[in-house]
Every structure is written in structure tokens, then in C-alpha cells.
């Protein structure tokens, strides 16, 4: 294999693809990236048996071929090369020569035969969606994906496509996030995408470009400009999320989002990794009063907000509360409550583009 390629194109591609590379694997090739030089394109792939990222960049190919190179080392080399044009050449001993300006490297590669094939699958459904919409949907829900592997199904989000509407639902047992957008698609299907995959999708999405999603029985493929991201789907039964949203609402308040975030953030100063005291919220009259008491002190605050319905005193984990508030995209939110032990519901003042639920913490009588 012998080729010339622009360093900036190569560095960006290697950086993005390397996120799918296994940091430690019993298969040495999976700690590398696969380079394939054919035609006028250099194909670059990373794969950890759960998620694979592939892209193609323009290159001047003098000799076709394939090689697997250490992802960590190759990324560092490319990032620090002095000139814009990079020459990459391999020989029959799997030695890779990398030259740029006066700098040159010789590193040991591996045969592409040792690299596992990325999955292929039969498409059962497909969807095309604006990159901006998909980015906002994932960003406003992925925070609620569980990191507890005892229930693997909740380490991903449910993509629920029906009635020309796509909903993304994430839940971890303490909070739930739902985001929806209308789409031009007649399919009725559900599938569960791992949270890790969604995080990688976020880093690649361009707002101006559409994302094409191909769904199979066990795998999903996201096509984002020149990048292809293939991932396994999570298998199992997802919670009936519609039934978990409380129907009754005894208390409602419309609150400025930024003011609410600031108040909860101030209470959070008394909490830390080892301290988890609830933020106490009292909804009454025309204000919401906040307080927090922990082993290191006390704090109080209040903000103006017209409260309709019954007065209520309720407590929340500050981090869960803030995560929900920071991932809405409206200046004001509607807070709905059904007593001190029922989840808080956060929705837009108008419409139903998102729903966030936060389970309360029991309060002591102190």
C-alpha cells in the first residue's frame, strides 16, 4: 500500500474513528484501526465488537492495500506531523512508513486478515431525519440513560417510531426523559440504541445534513455524511413508559428555566460525591422556596413563580433535578406535581415536544 493524503483530513478521521477502538482487547487487532486504500479513497475503520465507525477520505493511491495500525500511536503521530501532505507506505513485512516533511516513522502493523469483519445485516426499517433534530433529541434524553449494567436494557434509549412521530425515551429508575419530533415516515417500529452509540452519534452530527438510519433485527446503521456508525441493538422488553407518567396534577407552576437552574445550583453547593442531601422545594402562593441541609451547613433561597393548586413540599436529588432542567430548550418550563411522593413532571409551557420526570427523595421532618 502506498498513498498520499492531507494531514488535516487524516487527523480528523483518525480522531473520530478511534473512539470506536477497544482500549484493551484479547484480540490485538481491535486495538488498532483498519486502513484500506482502493480507488481514490482511504477507508478508515475502528471497531470494538459493539460499535464500529468507518469513514472515507480523499487520497492519491499509488498502490492499493490494507493494514491495521495501533490506533493510539497512529493518532499521536498524525496529530504531530509537521507538514500538510502525509505519505503512508507499507511493505510485505507489515512495516508502515509514515513521512511528512523531514519527519518519518516506521511502525509495525498487522495484517487486515486479523481484523474482525464489521457486521452486515438485512434492513427491516429505515428513517431519514434532519441532523439538527436528531442531535437535539439525543442530547435532551441521553443524560437519563442508566449506567447500571444489572439491567442492560436501560443502558440504551427506546426509539419509538409511529404515526409519523419519532420519540426517544431514556430511563434509569430515578428519572425519565422523552423527546419527540414529527418525521416523514410511515413505519411503526421500536428499537433500543445503546447510550454509548448515541454519544458517538452526537459528536459526528452536522446540523445541515440529514442522517439516514437503517435498522435490522440486531443492528443499526447511522449514515452521517462520510461516516458510517454501526452498532448492536439492545434486546429485551423496555418499560411501558406511557403508563409511568402520572395523570393527576394537584400543583402546577410556570417557571423561568434559568432562574430555576440557578436556584437549584446554589443549593447544590452543600452536596458532593459523598453527601446526598435532598434539595427541599416548597411550592406555595407566588413563589418556590428552596433549602438544603447537609453535614457541612444550610442554605436557603427562593424564586418568584405563580403556583396553581395545592401547596406542596417535596425533595429532589440536586443532580437529577439539574440534569433535567439543563437539557430542555425552552426559556420557561411547566412543573406539575401530584403530592410529595409522586414524580415531578417537567414539560414545555406550550406543546408536548419533551417530558422529563424526576423521582422525589423522602424528606425528614427536620
Predicted segments with their positions:
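Structural preference for solvent-exposed beta-strand-turn elements
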Residues: 1-366
Amino acid at each position: 500500500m502506498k498513498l498520499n493524503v492531507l494531514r488535516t483530513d487524516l487527523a480528523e478521521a483518525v480522531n473520530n474513528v478511534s473512539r470506536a477502538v477497544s482500549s484493551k482487547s484479547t484480540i490485538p487487532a481491535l486495538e488498532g484501526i483498519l486502513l484500506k486504500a482502493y480507488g481514490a479513497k482511504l477507508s478508515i475503520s475502528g471497531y470494538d465488537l459493539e460499535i464500529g465507525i468507518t469513514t472515507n477520505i480523499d487520497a492519491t493511491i499509488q498502490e492499493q492495500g490494507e493494514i491495521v495500525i495501533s490506533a493510539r500511536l497512529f493518532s499521536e503521530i498524525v496529530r504531530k506531523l509537521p507538514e500538510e501532505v502525509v505519505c503512508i507506505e507499507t511493505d510485505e513485512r507489515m512495516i508502515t512508513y509514515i513521512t511528512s516533511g523531514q519527519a518519518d516513522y516506521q511502525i509495525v502493523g498487522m495484517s487486515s486478515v486479523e481484523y474482525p469483519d464489521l457486521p452486515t445485516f438485512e434492513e427491516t426499517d429505515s428513517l431519514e431525519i434532519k441532523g439538527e433534530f436528531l442531535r437535539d433529541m439525543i442530547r435532551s434524553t441521553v443524560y437519563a440513560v442508566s449506567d447500571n449494567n444489572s439491567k442492560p436494557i436501560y443502558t440504551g434509549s427506546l426509539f419509538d417510531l409511529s404515526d409519523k412521530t419519532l420519540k426517544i425515551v431514556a430511563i434509569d429508575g430515578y428519572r425519565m426523559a422523552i423527546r419527540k419530533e414529527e418525521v416523514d415516515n410511515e413505519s411503526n417500529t421500536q428499537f433500543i440504541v445503546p447510550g454509548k452509540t448515541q454519544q458517538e452519534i452526537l459528536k459526528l452530527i452536522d446540523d445541515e445534513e440529514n442522517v439516514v438510519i437503517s435498522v435490522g433485527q440486531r443492528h443499526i446503521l447511522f449514515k452521517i455524511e462520510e461516516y458510517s456508525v454501526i452498532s448492536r441493538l439492545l434486546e429485551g422488553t423496555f418499560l411501558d413508559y406511557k403508563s409511568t407518567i402520572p395523570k393527576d396534577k394537584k400543583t402546577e407552576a410556570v417557571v423561568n428555566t434559568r432562574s430555576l437552574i440557578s436556584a437549584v445550583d446554589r443549593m447544590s453547593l452543600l452536596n458532593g460525591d459523598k453527601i446526598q442531601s435532598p434539595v427541599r422545594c416548597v411550592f406555595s402562593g407566588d413563589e418556590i422556596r428552596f433549602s438544603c441541609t447537609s453535614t457541612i451547613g444550610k442554605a436557603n433561597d427562593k424564586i418568584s413563580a405563580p403556583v396553581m393548586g395545592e401547596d406542596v413540599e417535596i425533595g429532589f436529588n440536586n443532580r437529577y433535578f439539574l440534569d433535567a432542567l439543563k437539557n430542555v430548550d425552552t426559556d420557561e418550563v411547566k412543573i406539575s406535581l401530584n403530592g410529595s411522593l409522586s414524580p415531578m413532571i417537567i414539560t414545555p409551557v406550550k406543546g408536548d415536544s419533551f417530558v422529563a420526570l424526576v423521582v422525589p427523595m423522602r424528606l425528614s421532618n427536620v
